[in-house]
Amino acid sequence: MLEEYRKHVAERAAQGIVPKPLDATQMAALVELLKTPPVGEEEFLLDLLINRVPPGVDEAAYVKAGFLAAVAKGDTTSPLVSPEKAIELLGTMQGGYNIHPLIDALDDAKLAPIAAKALSHTLLMFDNFYDVEEKAKAGNEYAKQVMQSWADAEWFLSRPPLAEKITVTVFKVTGETNTDDLSPAPDAWSRPDIPLHAQAMLKNAREGIEPDQPGVVGPIKQIEALQKKGYPLAYVGDVVGTGSSRKSATNSVLWFMGDDIPNVPNKRGGGLCLGGKIAPIFFNTMEDAGALPIEVDVSNLNMGDVIDVYPYKGEVRNHETGELLATFELKTDVLIDEVRAGGRIPLIIGRGLTTKAREALGLPHSDVFRQAKDVAESSRGFSLAQKMVGRACGVKGIRPGAYCEPKMTSVGSQDTTGPMTRDELKDLACLGFSADLVMQSFCHTAAYPKPVDVTTHHTLPDFIMNRGGVSLRPGDGVIHSWLNRMLLPDTVGTGGDSHTRFPIGISFPAGSGLVAFAAATGVMPLDMPESVLVRFKGKMQPGITLRDLVHAIPLYAIKQGLLTVEKKGKKNIFSGRILEIEGLPDLKVEQAFELTDASAERSAAGCTIKLNKEPIVEYLTSNIVLLKWMIAEGYGDRRTLERRIQGMEKWLADPQLLEADADAEYAAVIDIDLADIKEPILCAPNDPDDARLLSDVQGEKIDEVFIGSCMTNIGHFRAAGKLLDNHKGQLPTRLWVAPPTRMDAAQLTEEGYYSVFGKSGARIEIPGCSLCMGNQARVADGATVVSTSTRNFPNRLGTGANVFLASAELAAVAALIGKLPTPEEYQTYVAQVDKTAVDTYRYLNFDQLSQYTEKADGVIFQTAV
């Protein structure tokens, strides 16, 4: 084992990275070596045991905890690990398999003092808290000590407070840094391996950034040169962390700019991030990791500057001269406690433990922790989002600025974040989900899986289902197109993908750490954002699509001065706020998702859309059949699916919807008259905020066209198919087609559209996200593309690609003529589709499709109604 391990260490060192943590097999071999250590290897073996095993409920942690527990009890021995040392080391494992041995040790006079100290600093107790409480009530003095320590928050007060002054060297990335820059999609396979994945951070050359190997390895030498100044680095940018929800982006930044976490291999916390604007999901993942994110004017900060940051005073000064460079206010003073606790999640869990202990001991509420500021009283009404979150918190509504922990009814995870979420769940010692429904998809890696992806496909489903979650299968399709069909109206949820934007209810997408917390505990921390209201009125004009309305939102915000495309001094009224949409109440739920989905591109924290009951009743009636069909097809966890079906049936029995109050307050209101939108609206390369009229970009030569992503539904493919069916000869473009789900693909095949796509020479992808994310399939380098996908960030769909975002209808026309049409040309083409619009824009109602109803009708529930 040692020979193999040292070989691995050497291989990783050649790559410039630390070795992987030990796995269960290596840990089992290490146990045998610890029992009879080879001469001269003692120190090395102990270091492996202490520092190279993941904590929580990792498989290797199970072996480690079992060995240490056996040593503590005297069931086995090691010349290197005494029973006392074994208890001490169990105390470094955070939670999970180490807890019962520590609680048992409270009854051993020799080991109890060490066990008490260890438990006093262990937060992941969950229901094991009551075992300690029971011992304390029975008179165990050491259990009493533990209870008192928790009540006194010694776990928190023993950690160093946030410093008055933090001296750092500036690592500045000008313009906008999105999470794809920090965690590139083609490298998604390596995300759980943080040191390896971090090497790809900023691997594409840009102003001020010098990758070691452009397109492969990021600016490691540049970072190392700055570190030689003797101070930690701070990540600084004009706009930081937009785009996908990748916790891996935070992990990569902190690998270079954070602090080691004692006894936790290959993971770092802490760190400092300064941004003119910091995207909300990235801000949250920084908080969760114990970093200090600060929104501040960074125009006076330059690469390599040494600065002093005063978090309490809200000042940034030049380290040498003391010159004031910028001032700021922390988003909340609770950030100070979050940094001290090692992150927002440890703080929340720890505060809860302290509260529980104080209640058990009959003590008043602790005054140790900073509280979120009280929100000013208001006699005004609540918005729809405020009411939804309020209901999830058991109150009428939640005011902007208030801290709350809403109940998570639905949680989604996908396969490029799922392996990290799995690791986070292990760290949280989670063996069962508390959220009502947790769903795992395999949409980002199904098309062209690497061996590591195949391993994920084989191992992650059982991990999720064993904890009560629902697992999809590779090839099933896009996470959102499935999760939306499992939703309950007016409920709150989250997902490990920035496009988790419920069309009924509301979701606050998050990084994998927060998603794991939400799944494990059934709640999520939230500083309630303000809302921006977008009101549509009037009638849609001929040829105009919902995608044009999606792009009308940034266009009209630009017109009102609420949004700028320029990154320096960026204005974005939507950033960190909730986008609330009214004026389109009769949309089908599938259509409504097109609007809520795109709130991700606005950097909004979440989105609601006001719909009438009828489309929601139709949608849930269809979805009940789909979920029953899933049970018939052997999907699990069956109990979770049955419970969700019962929840849908209960709502349908009395279909009531929340509504915004007429006097609700909004940070801004944007009115859009549909009569004024007379031509398609696109987003120009390479910025989803850069909305343009078709007439402004007409004639642009197009090389490739992509019709697919979570922004599409079956109607879009019928529309494209009808346009393509009229075309004779070869297309002048390369056309990609990827339906969102296997159900869409099956129906399109049955209706003959796959034949049309095939004859047109289209490259038909399996349902999923491959090209949209750009992690597997890619367009040609430097291609000009029209895409129905979500984002057009630089290098996302292809290296150096210029991507226009547009409707499926406009994309199909561009595929046919090899350029962006004039508005008149476009109208000529779409008139062909409009003639059969009723047939084209039909949606998947599973209750009307015999291949689903026949199987659904045979399902007999195994749980009581």
Curated annotation (Swiss-Prot):
What domain of life does the UniProt record list for this protein's source?
A: Bacteria
What's a BP term from Gene Ontology annotated to this protein? tricarboxylic acid cycle
Q: Where does substrate bind?
A: 191, 244-246, 414-416, 498, 791, 796
Fetch the Pfam families from UniProt: Aconitase, Aconitase_2_N, Aconitase_B_N
**SUPFAM superfamilies with a match to the protein in the record:** Aconitase B, N-terminal domain (SSF74778), Aconitase iron-sulfur domain (SSF53732), LeuD/IlvD-like (SSF52016)
Cofactor(s) for this protein? [4Fe-4S] cluster
Q: How is the cofactor bound?
A: Binds 1 [4Fe-4S] cluster per subunit.
The enzyme class is lyase
State the deletion phenotype.
Cells lacking this gene do not grow on propionate unless glutamate is added, and the addition of glutamate does not restore growth to the level of wild-type. Also unable to grow on acetate and citrate and only slight improvements are observed when glutamate is added. AcnB mutant also shows an impaired binding to the surface of macrophage-like cells, is less motile and possesses fewer flagella due to a level of the flagellum protein FliC lower.
Q: Pathway, according to UniProt?
A: Carbohydrate metabolism; tricarboxylic acid cycle; isocitrate from oxaloacetate: step 2/2; Organic acid metabolism; propanoate degradation
Q: Looking at the keywords, is Lyase present?
A: yes
Reactions this protein catalyses:
citrate = D-threo-isocitrate; (2S,3R)-3-hydroxybutane-1,2,3-tricarboxylate = 2-methyl-cis-aconitate + H2O
Q: List the coiled-coil residues.
A: none
The Enzyme Commission number assigned here is 4.2.1.3, 4.2.1.99
An example GO CC term for this entry is: cytosol
Q: Where does [4Fe-4S] cluster bind?
A: 710, 769, 772
Functionally, this protein is described as follows: Involved in the catabolism of short chain fatty acids (SCFA) via the tricarboxylic acid (TCA)(acetyl degradation route) and the 2-methylcitrate cycle I (propionate degradation route). Catalyzes the reversible isomerization of citrate to isocitrate via cis-aconitate. Also catalyzes the hydration of 2-methyl-cis-aconitate to yield (2R,3S)-2-methylisocitrate. The apo form of AcnB functions as a RNA-binding regulatory protein which regulates FliC synthesis via interaction with the ftsH transcript to decrease the intracellular levels of FtsH.
The record's subunit annotation is: Monomer.
Spell out the protein name for this chain.
Answer: Aconitate hydratase B
